């Protein structure tokens, strides 16, 4: 039971990072978002390294044990691309305006500020009611879209932590970092539509709570089909899940994190953050052996 609580706790930590993004949007200097470039690049490096070096390898080992080396390798590859296909379908079902992979740039956030002026108390004031409603709709639909995306991410963190708590910590940290700009994409339009920082912060936090909900539903599913997940699952199921999770993480890194990092950074901020993330993850995995 303790391993299950740790796994659920890590997904809760990762999900709450959307609230950190919301706070940054309100209190950080609006003209300097380079820290987001490095942070999201770092997160991409961690997730790519873990996906290819650790999680995909775990899937291959489990499937080879269940089906033999050659059939297991084919099933591992199929499950990997199945994970990419799954998150890709989810991604493309969501309109780009509300898609969390389309994080608002500095220019877009400047447009929000131009659309709604700030009073001396820091509250937003929109003269155009239609524009205000559009901003609110954008923020709320973005929160919903992030919630949908966070379900498989929560399951990925949960499964990794259940198998290896140290690996789960690394993945939770990477997902938490990539949830920060998603929190910004929810809170900024809601704040400039309502003038209420508390409401904007609350919605960004709620969107991240889909992460532990996804983990909890995954746990209940495993409990229903396999009894006690902490006691171990059949290797063929664990292998397919790990390979699929690796595919999901690679898609998120390439489609979301790296483009976001490039959009916010200058020069080589993005690649430096990514390499640093890979190096830290490599050192962590080596020290844990």
UniProtKB/Swiss-Prot annotation:
The keyword Phosphoprotein is assigned to this record: no
The protein, known as: Zinc transporter ZupT
Binding site for Fe(2+): 150, 153, 179, 182, 211
PANTHER family for the chain: ZINC TRANSPORTER ZUPT, ZINC/IRON TRANSPORTER
Membrane spanning stretches: 4-24, 35-55, 70-90, 139-161, 206-226, 232-252, 268-288
Protein localization: Cell inner membrane
GO molecular function, one term: zinc ion transmembrane transporter activity
Keyword set includes Cell membrane: yes
Gene behind the chain: zupT
Residues noted as binding Zn(2+) in the record, renumbered to the chain: 153, 178, 182
Keywords, comma-separated and alphabetical: Cell inner membrane, Cell membrane, Ion transport, Iron, Membrane, Metal-binding, Transmembrane, Transmembrane helix, Transport, Zinc, Zinc transport
Membrane topology: Multi-pass membrane protein
GO cellular component terms attached to this protein's record: plasma membrane
Role this protein plays: Mediates zinc uptake. May also transport other divalent cations.
Native source species: Desulfosudis oleivorans (strain DSM 6200 / JCM 39069 / Hxd3) (Desulfococcus oleovorans)
Cross-referenced Pfam families: Zip
Reaction catalysis annotation: Zn(2+)(in) = Zn(2+)(out)
Family: Belongs to the ZIP transporter (TC 2.A.5) family. ZupT subfamily.
């Amino acid at each position: 039971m303790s391993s299950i609580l740790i796994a659920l706790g890590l997904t809760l930590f990762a999900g709450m990072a959307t609230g950190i993004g919301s706070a940054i949007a309100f209190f950080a200097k609006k003209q300097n978002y380079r820290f987001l470039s490095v942070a999201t690049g770092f997160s991409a490096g961690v997730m790519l390294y873990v996906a290819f070096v650790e999680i995909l390898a775990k899937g291959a080992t489990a499937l080879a044990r269940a089906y033999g080396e050659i059939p297991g390798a084919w099933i591992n590859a199929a499950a990997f691309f199945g994970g990419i296909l799954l998150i890709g379908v989810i991604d493309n079902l969501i309109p780009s305006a509300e898609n969390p992979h389309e994080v608002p740039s500095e220019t877009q956030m400047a447009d929000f500020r131009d659309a709604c002026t700030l009073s001396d108390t820091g509250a937003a004031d929109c003269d155009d009611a239609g524009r205000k409603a559009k901003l609110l709709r954008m923020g709320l639909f973005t929160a919903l879209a992030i919630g949908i995306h966070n379900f498989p991410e929560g399951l990925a963190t949960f499964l990794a932590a259940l198998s290896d708590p140290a690996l789960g910590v690394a993945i939770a940290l990477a997902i938490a970092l990539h949830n920060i700009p998603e929190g910004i994409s929810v809170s900024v339009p809601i704040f400039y539509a309502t003038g209420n920082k508390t409401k904007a912060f609350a919605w960004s936090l709620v969107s991240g709570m889909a992460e532990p909900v996804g983990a909890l539903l995954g746990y209940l599913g495993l409990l229903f089909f396999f009894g006690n997940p902490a006691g171990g699952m059949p290797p063929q199921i664990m292998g397919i899940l790990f390979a699929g999770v690796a595919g999901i993480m690679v898609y998120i890194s390439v489609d979301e994190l790296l483009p976001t990092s490039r959009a916010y950074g200058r020069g080589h901020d993005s690649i430096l953050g990514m390499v640093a993330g890979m190096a830290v993850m490599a050192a962590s995995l080596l020290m844990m052996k």
